[in-house]
Regions:
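Generic hydrophobic, helix-prone segments enriched in Leu/Val/Ile
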Residues: 18, 26, 39-44, 112-113, ...
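Short Cys/His-centered divalent metal-binding micro-motifs
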Residues: 2-21
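Amphipathic alpha-helical surface "interface" segments used
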Residues: 25-26, 41-46, 133-142
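Intrinsic-disorder-associated interaction segments
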Residues: 29, 33, 51, 55-58, ...
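C-terminal, charged low-complexity interaction regions
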Residues: 74-203
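Short flanking/linker segments adjacent to small metal-binding domains or redox-active Cys/His motifs
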Residues: 40-86
C-alpha cells in the first residue's frame, strides 16, 4: 500500500526487528518456516561472510542478539509468547529468553491491518479510526475463539505466500449509550504457523 518514506522506514525497521526476534523461536522443521532458523544462524556467523564489511555486520547482529536476552529468573509463564514456550524435555540451562517489545508488536500488527484493509477492501484506515492490536493470545482463549468463529462464518482466509495466512471478517458490537450496532473489521494474521496476531478496526 502507498506510504510516506518516513513511515515506510519506521515500520520496516520494526518489522525487521520483530522478524529477527521471532525467527529464533520457530520450528526449523515445520513446512511454514522451512529455512528460517538456518537463515538466522547464517546471518550471525562471521565465517559465512564474503567481505570484511559483511563480517562486521554479522558481529554487530550477534551483539544485538546478546542485548535482547532476558535473565531466565525474570521469566514467568504468563509472559511467554503463545506457542513460543520451551520444548518439553529441554534443560533449563539451555533456554535463552528473547524479549519482544510490546510497542513493536502493536506497531507491526497495525501495519498488517492497514495494509490488509487496503489490499482486501481497497480502502485506507483514516486517522480517526482506531486499529486495536490485541495482546498475544493462545488459540483456545475465549476472545481468540470468537474472532476465529466470526471470520469463519462472516469472512474469508487468504494465503499470502509461504507461511503467511490472513483471516478477514466482520462482527458487530452494541454501543451501550445508543443501543446501535457498530461494525468491526476483524483480522487474524498467522505467520510461519507460529506467530498469531489479532487486530480489529472500528468502522
Amino acid at each position: 500500500m502507498p506510504s510516506c518514506e518516513e513511515c515506510n522506514r519506521k515500520y520496516g525497521q520494526i518489522e525487521s526487528d520483530l522478524r529477527f526476534r521471532s525467527w529464533l523461536g520457530v520450528d526449523p522443521t515445520a513446512p511454514q518456516s522451512l529455512g528460517i532458523a538456518q537463515s538466522v544462524q547464517r546471518s550471525l556467523d562471521p565465517s559465512k561472510a564474503k567481505r570484511e564489511k559483511d563480517q562486521r555486520a554479522r558481529k554487530r547482529q550477534f551483539d544485538k542478539l546478546r542485548d535482547m536476552v532476558i535473565p531466565l529468573s525474570m521469566i514467568q509463564a504468563d509472559n511467554i509468547l503463545p506457542d513460543f514456550g520451551p520444548v518439553p524435555g529441554t534443560a533449563k540451562e539451555d533456554l535463552i529468553p528473547i524479549g519482544i517489545p510490546a510497542e513493536g508488536w502493536k506497531a507491526f500488527g497495525t501495519k498488517l491491518a492497514r495494509g490488509s484493509a487496503f489490499v482486501l477492501e481497497d480502502r485506507y484506515i483514516e486517522v480517526d479510526q482506531k486499529v486495536d492490536v490485541l495482546p498475544p493470545m493462545y488459540e483456545e482463549d475465549e476472545r481468540a475463539t470468537k474472532i476465529r468463529r466470526a471470520i469463519r462464518e462472516h469472512g474469508t482466509y487468504h494465503r499470502v505466500g509461504p507461511g503467511f495466512v490472513v483471516g478477514h471478517g466482520l462482527a458487530f458490537v452494541e454501543k451501550t449509550e445508543t443501543g446501535l450496532l457498530t461494525p468491526l473489521t476483524l483480522f487474524r494474521f498467522e505467520i510461519w504457523g507460529r506467530v498469531r496476531i489479532y487486530a480489529q478496526i472500528v468502522n
